[in-house]
Structures are given as C-alpha cells and as structure tokens.
Regions:
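Short acidic low-complexity segments
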Residues: 2-12
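Short loop/edge segments at beta-strand edges and connector loops
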Residues: 4, 42, 71, 133-136
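Beta-strand-loop-alpha-helix segment that lines the small-molecule cofactor/substrate pocket
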Residues: 15-21, 27-71
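Short beta->alpha connector loops
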Residues: 21-24, 46-47, 73-75, 137-139, ...
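Rossmann-like dinucleotide-binding domain that binds NAD(P)(H)
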Residues: 97-165
C-alpha cells in the first residue's frame, strides 16, 4: 500500500516496514504505527540517537508490540558460513570488519553504513563490550576499536576513500 502518511496504514495492513535514507526519520514515522500496536520492521539504523531508541523500545515493550531492526548482511550465506567456521576456531582473539563508510554522509554519517559492521561484530562476539574508541583518519578512511570484557578485540575499518566490499577476518 502506498500512503501519504504512515498512520494511513493503520487498518490496511497487518505489519509495516519503515525505511528512510536517514535514520533520524525512522522513529517519527513509526510512532503512530507503534501506538496502533502494529508489528514493525525498522530499517537500519533503528534511530539516530540512543535515548530516542530506548524510549521507543520501552514503549513497544509496554504495548507488547514486536519491533525489529537489523542489517541484512548477517542473513547472507557467506556470513553464515563465516560464523560457523568461527565457532570451530575456539577462543577468538580478534575480529576485523571492513566495509564502506562515509562519516560525513548526508544520510546520517557513520550510522548509514557503519551499522552493518557493528551488527556483524555483535552477532559474532556479543554485547559484553568494555571500551570503544574511534580513530579519525586524515582523509576518508577511519577505524574503531571495540574491546570485550572477556578478551577479544574487534576492529572496524571504515573505508571512505575507495569502494570496499564488506568482509570479515578473525584469529
């Protein structure tokens, strides 16, 4: 269904997908649908500011409305094969995720593509993160280091200076 306003979907569909190029528009577009208790898929990133996302998800929990948001990269066969091999390695020391990212993107900067790497990393190593540090490069390439409480370190290579496919490596 094509509608002029998100709330016009209420009564026409059983669930909705909310998708904008910039994540700051996702939750405002989803609010009326949430209040109508409509199950939601919200494209990545779920939101642009953490506090806004926490309030939205707390409201969804209170209303008992299912909400999901994720990168599609972990659904790909190559990612699933990597995850399976990773489990066979035993204790992981380091994980490196590389992919495209323009931190000055008009569609939300690092949130636009960086979320793909974050999603892949936390699915593989979990959320028990003790420290995160970003390093801004002199040009368009940057990195972020993620330290885990149980030992592993993940690095995100945010490549803005060339066309870089998403990929992972681990030790």
């Amino acid at each position: 269904n094509i509608v002029e306003r998100p709330e016009d979907l209420v009564g026409q569909v059983d669930a909705a997908a909310v998708d904008h190029r910039h994540g700051k528009y996702h939750l405002p577009a989803a609010e009326a649908l949430l209040e109508a208790k409509m199950p939601l898929f919200i494209d990545k990133p779920l939101c642009y500011r953490k506090a806004e996302g926490q309030l939205f998800l707390a409201r969804a929990k209170k209303l008992n409305v299912p909400v999901c948001s994720f990168s599609t990269l972990p659904k790909q066969a190559s990612y699933k094969a990597f995850a399976k091999k990773l489990k066979q390695l035993g204790e992981i020391q380091t994980l490196v995720a590389t992919g495209p990212c323009d931190i000055k993107s008009k569609w939300g900067g690092i949130f636009f593509y960086g979320i793909h790497q974050v999603d892949m990393i936390v699915r593989l190593l979990g959320c028990d993160i003790s420290h995160v540090q970003g390093s801004k490069g002199k040009r368009k390439n940057h990195s972020a280091q993620i330290a885990y409480s149980n030992g592993p370190v993940a690095t995100m290579n945010l490549v803005g200076g060339a066309s870089a496919p998403f990929h992972l490596s681990a030790i």
